[in-house]
Amino acid sequence: MITSITLLFSILWAQILSWISISGPLILFGLYYGFSITLPMGPSQILSIRAFLLEGNLSGLMALGGSTLGQLIILISIFYSPLYIMLLKPHAITLITLPYVLFYWYEIKDLSDYQPLRPITSLNDTGIIQIFLNSFLFQIFNPILLPSPVLTRLVKLFLFRYSHNSFFVISLFCGWLGGNILLINLSKFLLIRIKNNSSTLYLLVKRLIYRTFSIIIFVACLSYLGKFPVPFSMKKSSDESSLNEWKAERLSWLYKPWPTSLFNYRKWNRPLRYIENSRFSNKSPVKRNVSQYFFDVCLNDGRQRISFTSLPSFSIFEKNLKNYLNVSRISSSSDVFYQEWINTKKEQKDDLYSEVEERIKALDNGFSLEHAIEKRIGFSSINKEDIPNKTYDPFLDGEFRGKVAVSQSPLLLTGKSYGLTKTQKLLHLSRKNNKLKFWISNKWRKLERKDLPLPWEPLTQDARRVLILLIKGLRNKKSKIDSQRNDFSKEQGVIALNEENISPEFSAKTNNTNFLREKAIRKSHINWELVLNLSLRQRILYFNYLEKVKWETIKNSWKDLISGNFTEVKNIGSLVMKIMKIHQESPLQEFHKEVPRWTSKLKNDKFDVIAIGVTDIRQRKVRNLGYLIKGREKRRKIVRRFSQQSDFRRKLIKGSMRARRRKTLIWKILQFKTHSPFFLKITEKPALFRSTEIMEDIDVKGTFLNTIGIEKLISLLSERGVAIKGTKADRLAIANRWDFPLAQWGRSWLLIIQSYLRKYVVLPILIILKNISRLFLLQVPEWNEDWNEWSEEIHIKCTYDGTEVSERELPEQWLRDGLQIKIIYPFHLKPWHNSKFKEKGNRNMEPNFPHTQNKGKETSDNKAYRLQKNKKFKYSFLTAWGFQTNLPFGNIKKQPSFWKPVIKELKKRWKREILSKTANFYELYYNISLLYRKSDISNRFKIFAEFDIQTDERMNHEISKIQVNSESGGASVTDDGIKRESPLGITLNSENSNFSENEDFLWEIPVESRYKTAKNIKKLESLVVSKNNLT
């Protein structure tokens, strides 16, 4: 008896410590997972915070109440499987959650007025109910923003595992409640801080918060799209010869059960790639088949064993954890790391061995078997008299339970069992062996699915009769068709089937036929399982024929009824039901499911394979894929271009999870290209530092000092080649800049519009204006010539690379891949056609020689052929702005000017008509002036000669210079008289200086020399004047 209070407290404290030591880890786990229930921030928690900030404390508490109620229902559903399946079925959540979130975002995306920003102060407000329901439904749908739902699954797993432990349940509830209280307090604290510390009006702050949360909800929608399973249809190869099978495969998804009709259960989770070293043979050092399982070391019974179902993520995490904890320093070998667990298992095994050894020793010492063998716990009650027999004790099994003695004497058999016939015994045994089938059948009927028979149920009378007719028809057809080509004719084992018995007189040549024969012999009726074993084509034929027979039966019954045969009046109800259900799908349902099997040879070639929809691995994006036929042999050449854009799907196995792909890290909000994490440091380094490092490796001083060598090097390079390379690089850069879907879409439409406007709008208008203006200028119009040249212009649609496709048809995927438009013989508007002018000029310039006259007699046909043969092939590419280039994305081609020939012709006529007349007038004036000064010039030359003799030395020196100049100009003095030549070759004779004899000598002088002659005469006159002044 406890007499001291301290002793009482010490006992209680010891019990509490023992409870804590026993259930301490569970309490900690419960608190942790209770807090972690509210840790994954989903839309429900976001709505709660939004309600606190925008609509006050009351609406925030109601939103948090809805979230809490949703969490509570989810936790309770763990212990009730129908509710758990209804709430957490992934495919149903996929189809419900996303539309609901999008609808909610559409409601809150725009703020029409400030009414939603007012605080809610009453529970009677309709907005309270709306907030509560939205928060509750978002929590029920259970979407979270974390990339992996492992945390929430661990909570459910631990709660289900330790639900019998009150400490864990209480601690989990306390942690969950504490997490929600913490969320409430943090939301209120955030609300107070925003109200007190905002520099602007709180109403404007609310507007910003409203807009921010609408963006957050939209981002949550996008994140759900990446995490939810997406409907994915597997492509199946169909045989062109079997059209019926192809149709059945196309409609097979209608007959699949939910959710396999929309969702792909064959989707890869952790796909593997097989890399081949040789493209032409399978003989490579790499093993041919790769396992789809991951092998790793695990512990089992105290030993390390190889497990083939290990998770790669767990193995990688374990290795990283060992490296982080530096296990090699703690223990020299990996065995010591698990030594404690191995020792525990070894102790348990040793205890078991020692216990068995002691029991054997007890038997040797004379103890009975009952005392030596371990006593089993039995079923009993308080009254020892009510202890049941060991035969009926449910806690005992094996040898401890009594055996019911079964007498082998036929005298103990009942009359009923003794009088059974052989057939009844077989039927009794079949029923005994098929208890499971009977139980399933009874449950199936209770579920009100009587119209859907089970595989072992017999066929109806109509179905049996149709099957017999069908098989007989196929047997008759077999005698006409070769047996090797008809697969269905091999299954002749069901030919002699009647309504009650099946005759085994048929040949079994295939496994399927053997199975049917065994079923027919073993059972006395035809069931739906026999129909299930038919091929797909045979089943479709059977059910179509069965439907036709139903219609015929209904028609015949109504005909009998109308004709007066009232024997079928009692079956009118069944006939109406048949008419109502005639178009329903077949009542046959297959009780089998295909196991997802993936190929173990996913080949990853070294080169990019051009195969759209054939390979299992996504290859590089191909643009402008087509075929080009060249040569006389008409060989098909593949024309393709790989996209220059970064491909985020390249080398990704179709249907696999995108988040599992390595080496495509995305660390920016908007990232244009994919990068490997290995090169992150290089790509993030600024270009300035990289350029300085490159410049440090170059000898800058030597490069700039040795300028002569650089000039020689540049001179050796071909300027033309450098220009071609530069333009090609520029064109490729422009093409890559345009190579993304939105730009290709806009550019392609612009090209088509420009082509149409040029061909049918702009050029016809210019031709009409030109010829009308020629009519106003009293010139002959050139309608035929212009329209002929316009009709020669052809617009050919090409791919983005410039490969010609067709004049009328557009390339495939032209909106996505882009296109080019090539103009052959582009039309240029001319002011006149040069053929007429050339003919006129040739007629005037050609002399009248006999051989030239014969040439002029060339026929018009030969002339047209010669012109067509000598015609140069011209083409250009149209740009999106209407210009022309020689190559795609090349420099703009300079077009011939329309006004330049006109201006040139006007200049020629100006010189010929006006300037020639003014030159003639000037020459006439010049000749008259020469005649007037003829005598005066000769007398002045004589005065110069006399003056040269009488002047002093200084003047003689000057005169000698003048004479030298006159001699250099071609003048000479003779004794007979003064005879001088002008610098232009004009002879002036003093004795015979009659200009009338040589009136046309000036016409022989060139035009330029006439102006020089006038200048020399002026200089000569100025010299004479200066000498006269000196004298």
Curated annotation (Swiss-Prot):
InterPro entries, per database record: TIC214
Keyword Protein transport: yes
Transmembrane stretches, start-end: 11-31, 68-88, 92-112, 127-147, 166-186, 212-232
Domain of life: Eukaryota
GO annotation, biological process: protein transport
One term under GO cellular component: chloroplast inner membrane
Subcellular location, principal: plastid
Compartments reported by the entry: Plastid, Chloroplast inner membrane
Keywords linked to the UniProt accession: Chloroplast, Membrane, Plastid, Plastid inner membrane, Protein transport, Transmembrane, Transmembrane helix, Transport
Keyword DNA damage: no
Topology in membrane: Multi-pass membrane protein
Summary of subunit composition and partner proteins: Part of the Tic complex.
Similarity annotation: Belongs to the TIC214 family.
Described purpose of this protein according to its UniProt entry: Involved in protein precursor import into chloroplasts. May be part of an intermediate translocation complex acting as a protein-conducting channel at the inner envelope.
Alphabetized PANTHER family for the sequence: PROTEIN TIC 214, PROTEIN TIC 214-RELATED
Stated name of the protein: Putative protein TIC 214 N-terminal part
Organism: Anthoceros angustus (Hornwort)
Taxonomic lineage: Eukaryota, Viridiplantae, Streptophyta, Embryophyta, Anthocerotophyta
